Each structure stands twice: as C-alpha cells, then as structure tokens.
Amino acid sequence: MKRRWSLITAIAVLTVALAFVVVQLVRGQGAGDQPAAAKPVASAPGTDPGALRGVAWWPLHQSGTAKAGERDAEALGRTQWVDGPTGGALQLDGLSGYAETGTRLDTKGQDYSVAARVRLTADDMNGFHTALSQDGDQISAFFLQYSGQDQNFAFSFSGARTVAEKTEKPQAGRWYHLTGTYSQKDHRMQLYVDGRLAGSRIATSSVDPTGEVVLGRAKFNGETVDFWQGDIADVHLYDRELTPREVESLSAREPD
C-alpha cells in the first residue's frame, strides 16, 4: 500500500512539473512579442521639434533658403553673410540692408508668434532697430525690436509697446533670442528674451497687415525706418501663440 501511494505521489509531482514546463514554453514563445500597441501619446508642447518649425523658418545660414514655408528670403541693400550662433547669420548695416520674405501673417484675426536670434553692434544703442516687422499701408503691424528710448528689447504695435523689464539691458556684440507672441482672445502681447518672459501687456493693433513680413527694418508714416544694425539668424513665424515651454525649447535649440 505504501508503495502504491508513493507511486501516485510521484505521478502527481511529475504532472505538476510538466504543466509548469508547458506554461513556461508558451510564455517563452511570446517573449519577443510586443504588447498590444496603445495609442501614441502626443508630445507635450515644447518637446516636439517639428511643431517648432512654424509656418516659415529662415535659418539665414549663408543663404535665404527657407527650411519651412514656401518662400525664400531675399536680402536687399547692404548685407553680407557672417558666422552666427547656430551656423550663420545675415549682417545688416543699419542704413539700407534688410530682407523680404514674401510671407504674411494674419495679425488681425489669428494668434501669432515671431522669433529670431539677434545681435546688435555698438555703433548706435540710442535709436530704434527692428529685427522683424510686417508692413501695413503706412505703419508696421508689429515690431520685434530694440528700443533706444527704453534701452532694451521690445515687442510693439502702433501706440503700444511691451518692453523687456525683467532682463538686463542688452549688450552690443552678444547674441540674444527674442520671441514675441500675441493672443487675439486675451489681447495679450508678450515678449520673451532668451526663453524667459520679459514683458507682457494688454493691447490691440488697428493696423491691417497689407504687406509681407520683413527682416531688418520697419515702416512708419509710409517710410522705411529703424533698420537693424547687426546680425539676424533663425527667423521663425507661427500662426499661433507659442506656450512658455515652447519658447524656452526654441531658445535652447533649433528644431531639426
């Protein structure tokens, strides 16, 4: 009887062991398989390099070729190509040099943002120098500029100016990253310097954007004014208001 029970016990143990081996083999066959794919999670704002290209992007690395958008920038007046912070830049003389983009933003009906890397020379830190603007009939729809009156960077409309109040005064010969954003819903214009919010105010512009975005000058009373004296690189245009995180990301690194 004892032998019989010993035999039954041995068979039971072998059965359990065999079942365990079979389970492990089944699992092993699927070890290299991936689990059922979940829906991809969208990148958080500021982490998707493609989204930061914008509707237009001109690196200005020895040419006006666009990396986003359909139109290249055309340099006019006294300009030359120089080294820049990320590969090259367009140098403007402060008298006649600027660049046309052939591109428009809907600054009256849509949120928008503009950004550029800029460097001023030491020749004139008391005047107005505009890095980016968009022509209206008589005056620019916006100005991303240096204000000699305030001795600092500014994002401006006709009759309204957001000055960089949270940063030190700009130094000639140093590169800065400037971003101007506008929300139609909140009527909020904001200026960022090197990825950080530097100024904000509530304002509206009555100027219709009848012309193109221009690099290196502005328009006032029907005349071209405020020519940039220094260098400009990596110009971006957006048909939306960038988030603070996106601005910080763009300032730190250009998209691929």
Kindly give the residue locations of the regions a language model identified:
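Surface-exposed loops/turns
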Residues: 108-109, 171-172, 209
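Extracellular glycan-recognition modules
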Residues: 51-55, 62-72, 83, 95-153, ...
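A general beta-strand register signal
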Residues: 91, 156-158, 192
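Short tryptophan-centered beta-strand motifs in secreted/extracellular beta-sheet-rich domains
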Residues: 173-182, 191
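Extracytoplasmic low-complexity segments
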Residues: 2-96, 185, 199, 248-256
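Flexible glycan-contacting loops in extracellular carbohydrate-active proteins
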Residues: 201-231
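Short, aromatic/His-centered strand-loop micro-motif at the edge of beta-sheets
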Residues: 102, 153-177, 222
